[in-house]
């Protein structure tokens, strides 16, 4: 498969590269200042344990936190770790909220804590994928091979022979074949499709009016509008809007209430391609749900079949930050301590990441505000967190 070289940072997705300032040396030296404390149990459904209880070397984690405090890693707002089903680490750091019109896209300076909701940006896409899976599990949607127009009677006039072949799976894998320019153009330019989509009075019409440029299912074109289309399909099929559906079938069963979807203006449709605000501790529940085959506290929220289908490779990418793509999940092999760690992850602009490592039963969540620089998430994983796992 041929891919363009995408080089510009965009509003709806944050690249995660592995470069940053050089950290201090001394891999197993804890350094001075920070003292690790086991996370408290707050009644939110998480059982907690200490790092040593699950075989994680606390010294390397302490070194990481000292480096964040020393601004070696800047604008990291949270690091949360779940291992073996237990919440074993959470720390929060001050930094800037997202502000689209601010310098470096920074808004207000905030003292983040476990109750502070954070913008997840494009990590929201993986949540939308889960909603599609639930809609299929519940029988609202027949399957991923359904034509999108089976659920879009309002837009049937835009259907033609080529577009009739677009399926739900094509939207989930970013292979709809629709012409779309989102990765190789600045958000300040008039031809940036997601900006035009967001501000359209009818974003779905804007999307489906695009011509087909490749056969559906063959080429990867990152397309946030396609994810909002999935939200509209869930809405039509279930007769609940995305906010209602997610509360009933996902967030409610997870015991999550401190979250907020965003709404596109002037259309009023729910923004499913990005920007849900949620706490990192609750975001980790979502990652653990997929690590645990769709089960949370004994309840099967998403089918095991959907978890496996949505986190396997459909499109090979071979990019620096991802090897392949599933159903709105990225997949990557990490290398640390002469070991290979398979992962799937959700990722958003600025350093938002839900990294799931099935082989070692671990979930790591990051939030941050590195909107014009490379987020350090991958370096932190490979230099500190993965090597700390015994």
Q: Which role fits each region the language model picked out?
A:
Residues 346-390:
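Structured C-terminal helix/loop/strand segments within mature extracytoplasmic catalytic/sensor domains
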Residues 1-17:
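Sec-dependent bacterial lipoprotein signal peptides
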Residues 85, 105-107, 116-144, 171, ...:
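Active-site SXXK
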Residues 119, 138-178, 209-211, 236-273, ...:
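Active-site helix/loop module of the DD-peptidase/beta-lactamase fold
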Residues 3, 19-107, 136-141, 201, ...:
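N-terminal leader/targeting segments and the immediately adjacent pre-domain N-terminus
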Residues 187-199, 203-209:
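Amphipathic alpha-helical interface segments
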Residues 226-233, 274-295, 352-368:
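Active-site-proximal alpha-helical segments within enzyme catalytic domains
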């Amino acid at each position: 498969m041929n891919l363009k070289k995408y080089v510009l940072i965009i509003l709806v997705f944050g690249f995660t590269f592995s470069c940053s300032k050089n950290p201090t040396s001394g891999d197993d030296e804890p350094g001075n200042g920070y003292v690790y404390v086991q996370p408290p149990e707050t009644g939110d459904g998480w059982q907690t344990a200490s790092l040593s209880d699950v075989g994680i070397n606390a010294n390397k984690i302490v070194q990481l936190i000292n480096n964040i405090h020393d601004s070696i890693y800047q604008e990291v707002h949270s690091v949360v770790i779940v291992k073996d089903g237990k919440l074993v680490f959470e720390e929060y750091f001050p930094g800037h909220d997202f502000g689209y019109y601010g310098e470096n896209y920074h808004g207000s300076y905030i003292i983040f804590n476990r109750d502070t909701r954070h913008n997840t940006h494009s990590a929201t896409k993986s949540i939308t994928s889960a909603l599609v899976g639930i809609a299929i599990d519940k029988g609202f949607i027949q399957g991923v091979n359904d034509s999108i127009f089976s659920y879009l009677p309002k837009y049937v006039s835009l259907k033609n022979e080529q577009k009739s072949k677009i399926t739900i799976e094509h939207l989930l894998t970013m292979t709809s074949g629709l012409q779309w320019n989102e990765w190789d153009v600045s958000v300040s330019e008039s031809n940036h499709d997601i900006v035009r989509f967001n501000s359209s009075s009818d974003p779905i019409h804007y999307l489906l009016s695009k011509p087909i440029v490749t056969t559906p299912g063959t080429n990867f074109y990152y397309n946030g509008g396609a994810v909002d289309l999935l939200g509209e399909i869930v809405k039509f099929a279930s007769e609940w809007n995305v906010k209602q559906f997610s509360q009933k079938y996902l967030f409610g069963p997870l015991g999550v209430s401190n979250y907020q979807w965003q709404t596109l203006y002037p259309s009023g449709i729910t923004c499913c391609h990005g920007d849900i605000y949620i706490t990192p501790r609750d975001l980790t529940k979502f990652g653990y749900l997929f690590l645990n085959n769709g089960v949370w506290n004994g309840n099967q929220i998403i089918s095991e079949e959907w978890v496996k289908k949505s986190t396997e490779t459909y499109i090979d990418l071979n990019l620096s930050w991802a090897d392949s793509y599933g159903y709105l999940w990225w997949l990557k092999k990490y290398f640390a301590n002469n070991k290979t760690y398979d992962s799937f992850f959700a990722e958003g602009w600025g350093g938002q990441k839900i990294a799931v490592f099935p082989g070692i039963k671990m979930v790591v969540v990051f939030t941050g505000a590195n909107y014009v620089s490379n987020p350090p998430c991958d370096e932190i994983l490979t230099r500190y967190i993965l090597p700390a796992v015994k």
